[in-house]
Amino acid sequence: MEENPLRCTICKNDFEEPILFSCQHTTCRKCSNGSPSCKTCSPGPSTSRSHTPQPDKLAAFLLDASKEEMEQCANCEQITLPMFYCETCQQSLCLACRNVTHQARMFSSHKIISSEERSKVYSSSLCKDHNEPYILYCSDVRKLVCIQCFNGRPLEERHSFISIEQGHRMCLEKIEQSAAKLRFYQSERQEELNVRQRILDEASNFDDAKTSLYQLCQQIIDTVMTTRETLAKELVKQQEQSDEQCKRQIKEIEAVMGPVRLCLFSAQILCTTASKLDVLQLCPQLQKRISVLLDKTVDKLPVSSTPDSIEVRSDLAKSLEPYLGMSAAWCPISVSREGSSSNSYKRGSGSHKALSMLSKFQTTIDLAGAFGQLFGKVEHPLRQLVVELSSISQQVLETQRDLTIRRCIIEKEDVEKLVKMCKKIEASLGMHSAALDGMQSEMQEIWQEQLDRVRRQQIIYREKVEEILNLRETARQILTAAKQMVPYVSCILNMNAMIAPKRCHPPDPAPMESICLEITGIEPNSQNRIMAIEKEEENRRLNQEAKKKEELAGQSAAMKSLKHGKTKRKEMHHRMMLNTNRERSPGGTDSALTSPCIRRLTSTALKEETASELDAEEILDEIFELSGEQYEEVVDGTLTEEDRCSSALLLSLELQNESVSPLPSLEQLLGRISLASRVTSDIGFSRGAMLQSLNDVFALQKPPTPENISVSEERNVLASAVRNAEKRKSGAGLPTTSEKEEMIENDEIIVEKETETEKKKVIRRRVKKAECEQSEEDVTTTFTFGPPPDCPFVPQEIFDKLGESDEKLGTFEAKERVLQSLKQKMNQKNGIDNDN
C-alpha cells in the first residue's frame, strides 16, 4: 500500500514545518532534532559532513493547498456543486445563483470560471526587494520580476524577460516533461522491486537443491564428501549474499519511492490547481529535485543463486575426473541466469567456441543419424534467415546513417518495406524457435540411447537457442529503430513536398532572355535563326515607330491646346515659294526652276514665322534680284484641301510650258568645266535649287548617311503676299495707291519685326472665324506666274580658281567658297543701297 507523500516517514503524521535534506527526503523539523543527516537514509549517526536542511517550500505549499476549504456561495451561503467563481465580482457562486444574478446584459462582460479552475495565490505577489507587483518572468534566472527589477537590468539582458502567461506555459511544459521521465523512472524501480521480492519468495528452492546434493553425494561418499561441503558452503554464502543484497536494495528503492511520490504529487498539483505565480516560483525547486532523483541509480540485480543440478554435476565431474575419467568437455555449460533478460543478447555466441573444441570428424558423427535429420530441418532455414537478417540489419543501419548523418531524404515506402521484412524475419524466427522446442521431446529419446553424444548435442542445441534469442533481440532492436524512423521520414517528405516545387523549378526567364536563349540555341546558318533575328528587328522597329507616333501625337495635342496670340499681319509683295522638287533633264535643266516664284495662299489659321526667319529670307530674295517684270510663263497651281490644311502648305503645279533653262552640272560646280560657259538666264534664282546642288556636291565627297542627308522644308507664305500678287496680276503689274499704302504698312511692320527679333519671340496672330470659313470654301485656286529670274551674281575669281586647280573640291571648301561669293554679293548690294 502506498503511503501518503504529505506524511512524515518518522512520526507518520502530516508534515509540520517540513525541511528538505540533500537526499531529497522531507521530514518534520522536530523529527530531525536538528541533525544535518537524514534519519530515513542513515538511522545511525553520520560522520560525513552534510548540508544543512532547508525549509521545504514545495511541501508547505502542498499542505496549504490540501487544507483549503471550498468557499460558500456569496448569495445563498451554501455549497452546491458545481461551484463557480466570478473574477470580476471576486465572489463564489453556485449554479442557481449564477443563472439568477448574472443573466442581465450588464453582467455579460464578467468573467466566470469553475471553482476547479480558480487558483488561489498562497505565496506573495509582491517583490521582496521593491514591494512592487510582479509583471514579468525572467527565463534566465527563473524568477518573477517587478517594474523596478526590470528597469534595473541592463538593456543587453532584457531579452530574457517574458510575460507571466508565457512563463506559465513554459514552466508547465517543463513540468510535464520532467514528470513523464519521473513516471518512467518509477515504473522501472517498481519492476526491480517486484523482481527482488520474488527472489526472496523462492528461498524454498535452496532446501530442495541441498537435498538433491546430499542424495548425489551419497553415491560417491569418500570422494564427494569434500566437494559436498565446499559446494554447501558456497551455496550458503551465496544465499546470504543474495539476501543481504536484496534487502539492502529494497531499502534503497523504498527510500527513493517516497520523494518520487512527493514530486509526482507536487507536479500534479502545480499543473492543475496551483496559481501561475506559485507555479513560476516553485517550478525551479521541483525541477532540481526531480533531476536529483533521476540521477540516483540502484545496483544491478544479484546473480541468481538458485542451484542447478547440471552445475552441481559439472563440479562433481571435475572432482571425480581422476577417478572416473570424465572430462569437463562432456558436461553442459552453466548458464548464469540474471534477473533481467535484457542483457541476454549481449552474451556472445558460444557455439563457435564450443565447436572449436570438437573435431570436424566428431561434429560429423554427432550430426549423423536421427539427430542430424531433425536438426537439419532447422539448421538450413536458420542459415538463410541469418543471411537475410544480416542484410536487413545493414540496410537499416545505412538508412539510419542517411537520415541522421548524411541528411538524406528517405522515401516512406522504403522504411515501411524494411519494417515488413523485419516483422517477417521475426515471425520466421519465432516459428523456428517453436520448432526447436517441439524437437526436444524427440531428442530426449535419442539422448537416452547415446549418452556420450548427448553432451555435445546439448552444447550445439543450447548455443543455437541462444543464437536465436540473440537474433530475435537484434531483430526487435532493428524493428524498433525502423519504426522510430517512420515519423521522421514522413515529416521530411511532407517538408520536401512543400519545398520541392520551389527548389526544383527555376523561375521563368524574362521575355528578352528567353528570346536570346532561343536564338543562341539555333545553329548559326539555320533559317530559323535568321527568321528569329529578322522578327526581333521588325518588332524593335515597330516599337520605335509606335514611340515616335506617341511623341508626335503628344506634341500635336499640346500645340492644339495652345491659344493663338493676336499679332500684326505682314504683307510682302515679293513673298514667294521655291519648289525644290527637281527633275533633271538630259540637258541639265531643272524643270522645277521654270517657275520658282510660286505664290502660296496661306490660311489665316497658320502660324506666323519668326522675324529672324523672315529677315533672312528677305535678304536672300534681294540677293537673287527677283522681279515680277520678267515673269513670262504662266504656271497653274491647284491647292488641294489636304495641302491647305497642313502646316507646310504644298501646291501641285501643272506647268504649261516645259521649256526650261538647264542648271549647272556637278562638273561645273566642282571646277572641272568652266561655270561661266554654261550659265543660263534662269540659274541660281531658286534658293532650293542652289541648296540641292550643294547637297549633290557634298554627297559626292562622302557616303550618304542619315546624319548628312539634308532636308529643306518649304516656308509658309503670308496671305498678304498672295493677295498682293493677285492684285498686281489683275492690274498689269502696276501697284495702285492702296497697294502702295499697304506696302508702306508692310515696311513698317517689318521694322517692328526687326525690333522684336532681338527678344527672340515668336509672334502669333488671332484668326477670325469668318476668314477661316472663307478660306475653307476655296478648295482649289489656280495661279499664273512669270518667267524665272536671271542668274545670280557669281564672282569670276571663284571660277578661275576652280579651273586652275586640278585637285578635287572638298565638302568644307565648296561650302566656304559659295558662302564667300554670297557675302561679297551682299556687301555690294548694301553699298549700292547706301549710295542711293
UniProtKB/Swiss-Prot annotation:
Zinc finger B box-type: from-to: 68-115, 122-164
Gene Ontology MF term list: Hsp70 protein binding; transmembrane transporter binding; zinc ion binding
Coiled coil segments of this chain: 527-557
Keyword Metal-binding appears in the UniProt entry: yes
One GO cellular component term: perinuclear region of cytoplasm
CDD domains according to UniProt: Bbox1_RNF207-like, RING-HC
Sequence positions that bind Zn(2+): 73, 76, 97, 102
Ranges of compositional bias, category Basic and acidic residues: 540-552
Alphabetical keyword list: Coiled coil, Metal-binding, Repeat, Zinc, Zinc-finger
Zinc fingers (RING-type), renumbered ranges: 8-42
Basic residues biased stretches: 561-571
PROSITE patterns cross-referenced by the UniProt entry: ZF_BBOX, ZF_RING_2
InterPro entries with a match to the protein in the record: RNF207 (IPR039320), Znf_B-box (IPR000315), Znf_RING (IPR001841), Znf_RING/FYVE/PHD (IPR013083)
The UniProt record lists the keyword Repeat: yes
Sequence segments annotated as region (Disordered): 540-571
Name of the protein: Probable RING finger protein 207 homolog
Organism: Caenorhabditis briggsae
